[in-house]
Curated annotation (Swiss-Prot):
Gene3D superfamilies: 1.10.3730.20
Membrane-topology descriptor: Multi-pass membrane protein
GO MF assignments: transmembrane transporter activity
Disulfide feature: none
Cross-referenced PANTHER family: MULTIDRUG TRANSPORTER EMRE, SMR FAMILY PROTON-DEPENDENT DRUG EFFLUX TRANSPORTER SUGE
Cellular component GO terms, alphabetical: plasma membrane
Protein name, UniProt field: Multidrug resistance protein mmr
Organism superkingdom: Bacteria
GO biological process: response to antibiotic
Source species of the chain: Mycolicibacterium paratuberculosis (strain ATCC BAA-968 / K-10) (Mycobacterium paratuberculosis)
Main location: membrane
Cited SUPFAM superfamilies: Multidrug resistance efflux transporter EmrE
Cellular localisation: Cell membrane
């Protein structure tokens, strides 16, 4: 169940981050409200995941790594961000780091 809360936290964070550009510097009301609510929900669900037994280091590593990878994917596919070798290698290294953290008994 802790992983379900974590997945929902990641998705809320990804939605909020994806909306940042549409807030136009937090000058547009509804995109700003939805963005800030997304971040609040994300942190609350991350906290629930940790309070229900997931190790803090594992939860945060997964939350940040998967969120980062998804944001890069969304930026490339939908927001016009160019793909580059640097981005691919960077996301690969992030994923490798999270896998390494989990394999070394951090949980």
């Amino acid at each position: 169940m802790t992983y379900l809360f974590l997945i929902c936290a990641i998705l809320a964070e990804v939605v909020a981050t994806s909306l940042l550009k549409s807030t136009q510097g937090f000058t547009r009301l509804w995109p700003t409200v939805i963005c800030l609510l997304g971040y609040a929900v994300s942190f609350a669900l991350l906290a629930v995941s940790i309070s229900r037994g997931m190790q803090t280091d594992v939860a945060y590593a997964l939350w940040s790594a998967i969120g980062t990878a998804l944001i890069v994917l969304i930026a490339v596919l939908f927001l016009g961000s160019p793909i580059s070798v640097t981005k691919v290698v960077g996301v690969g290294l992030i994923i490798a780091g999270v896998v390494t953290l989990n394999l070394t008994g951090a949980h």
